[in-house]
Amino acid sequence: MPDTPVEDSLFQIIHCFHHYAAREGDKETLSLEELKALLLDSVPRFMDTLGRRQPYYITELFRAADKNKDNQICFDEFLYILGKLVKDYHLQFHRQLCAHYCTEHSLY
């Protein structure tokens, strides 16, 4: 049985994390530089749409996710980052739907 699209997406997330984590130091964690590269290379549309490409945003996201304050992002902390980005993108999607609906129905 082939993987479903969601299963394939989950595998890709795991692979992406390990691909970038292997660039320097600990192969099971991301440094700030590895996280920046991962986000800007792998989810550029999310970052652009959310207005999140600024280095300070990624640095703050790193600090918020680094729960144990070891200056590394483990996989669980990475999932927190992905969750935040997906929630922000989902909210943006709903804002666009509302704006489209309001425009179509002359509510502005």
Curated annotation (Swiss-Prot):
Q: Does the keyword Magnesium apply?
A: no
| One GO cellular component, as annotated | extracellular space
GO MF terms on file? calcium ion binding; chemoattractant activity; identical protein binding; transition metal ion binding
Q: Which UniProt keywords apply?
A: Calcium, Metal-binding, Zinc
Q: Which gene codes for it?
A: S100a15a
Q: Which Pfam families match?
A: EF-hand_1, S_100
Species of the source? Mus musculus (Mouse)
Whether Metal-binding counts among this entry's keywords is: yes
Q: Which residues bind Ca(2+)?
A: 66, 68, 70, 72, 77
Q: Which GO terms describe its biological process?
A: inflammatory response
Instruction: Report what the protein is called.
Output: Protein S100-A15A
**Disulphide bridges, residue numbers:** none
Cited InterPro entries: EF-hand-dom_pair, EF_Hand_1_Ca_BS, EF_hand_dom, S-100_dom, S100_Ca-bd_sub
Q: Which residues cross the membrane?
A: none
Q: Which residues form a coiled coil?
A: none
Start and end residues of each EF-hand domain: 53-88
Q: Tell me the domain of life.
A: Eukaryota
